[in-house]
């Protein structure tokens, strides 16, 4: 039991730290499962699905006041209505492709080799974008032009490849389309809510036969750790990238991906 609790804490930290950073939570969880020797058990696969809800609730908690104002204004405030429509438009491409090709992607791309290569390539792209002399024209995540929301949603589809990073794809897409760093990161958080809830419900339904109450304590620990860690990380992340950009996270990706490839090549 103690070893399972330790694994739950580690995976909860990995999920909470990486979910909203441009480093790929799915990729890190896959590597953690591989190198911590969790085995190919149905429980641990289900566990990594369930703890995502902790990270989702962290965003809802942090942005509750703003999201509540938007919800109240959905039927009377044009700005709130436009933002809600924008989020739905951005969510749509991933929902469609996920429904059509999600099974294929998980069957053929969810392996450590793909993750490591994706981490390295994504890190190189993040380094490149961070060095560009971009001139932002959008500084408010809730007021992007409607076509911009759609293009960001299309960029998010790249994150279906494990190791690419959902937040990384949406942040890079938003910045190239004119958003400043803070607005790009904030919209990535907002878009995470329907995207992650949709993925959570879909995966939960597909794996419903493996969900039992036998490991409820382990799941509760992972959930709580993910929630608390995500809150700390999101608050720190916005302040950091506003001042320093994404270079640290780009090198993080490259280093983790390279070390992963070396370990895989050595048969670890």
UniProtKB/Swiss-Prot annotation:
Transmembrane segments: 47-67, 83-103, 109-129, 144-164, 184-204, 217-237, 246-266
E.C. no: 3.6.1.27
A cellular-component GO term for this protein: plasma membrane
Membrane topology of this protein: Multi-pass membrane protein
Reaction catalyzed: di-trans,octa-cis-undecaprenyl diphosphate + H2O = di-trans,octa-cis-undecaprenyl phosphate + phosphate + H(+)
Record function comment: Catalyzes the dephosphorylation of undecaprenyl diphosphate (UPP). Confers resistance to bacitracin.
Family the UniProt entry places it in: Belongs to the UppP family.
Additional notes on this entry: Bacitracin is thought to be involved in the inhibition of peptidoglycan synthesis by sequestering undecaprenyl diphosphate, thereby reducing the pool of lipid carrier available.
Name of the protein this chain belongs to: Undecaprenyl-diphosphatase
Species assigned in the record: Rhodopseudomonas palustris (strain BisB18)
Gene: uppP
């Amino acid at each position: 039991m103690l070893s399972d609790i330790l694994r739950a804490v580690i995976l909860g930290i990995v999920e909470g730290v990486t979910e909203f950073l441009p480093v790929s939570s799915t990729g890190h969880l896959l590597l953690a499962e591989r190198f911590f020797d969790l085995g190919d058990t149905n429980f641990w696969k289900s566990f990594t699905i369930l703890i995502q809800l902790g990270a989702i609730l962290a965003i809802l908690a942090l942005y509750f006041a703003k999201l509540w104002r938007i919800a109240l204004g959905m039927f009377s405030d044009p700005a709130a209505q436009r933002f809600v429509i924008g989020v739905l438009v951005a969510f749509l491409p991933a929902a469609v492709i996920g429904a059509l090709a999600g099974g294929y992607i998980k069957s053929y791309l969810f392996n450590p080799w793909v993750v490591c290569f994706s981490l390295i390539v994504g890190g190189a792209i993040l380094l490149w974008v961070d060095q560009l002399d971009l001139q932002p024209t959008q500084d408010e995540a809730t007021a992007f032009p409607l076509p911009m929301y759609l293009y960001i949603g299309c960029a998010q589809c790249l994150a279906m490849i494990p190791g690419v990073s959902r937040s990384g794809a949406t942040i890079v897409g938003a910045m190239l389309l004119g958003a400043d760093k803070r607005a790009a990161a904030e919209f990535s958080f907002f878009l995470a809510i329907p995207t992650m809830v949709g993925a959570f419900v879909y995966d939960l339904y597909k794996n419903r036969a493996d969900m039992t109450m036998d490991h409820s304590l382990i799941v509760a620990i992972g959930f709580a750790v993910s929630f608390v860690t995500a809150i700390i990380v999101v608050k720190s992340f916005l302040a950091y990238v506003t001042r320093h950009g994404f270079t640290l996270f780009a090198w993080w990706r490259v280093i983790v991906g390279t070390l992963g490839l070396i370990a895989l090549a050595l048969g670890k």
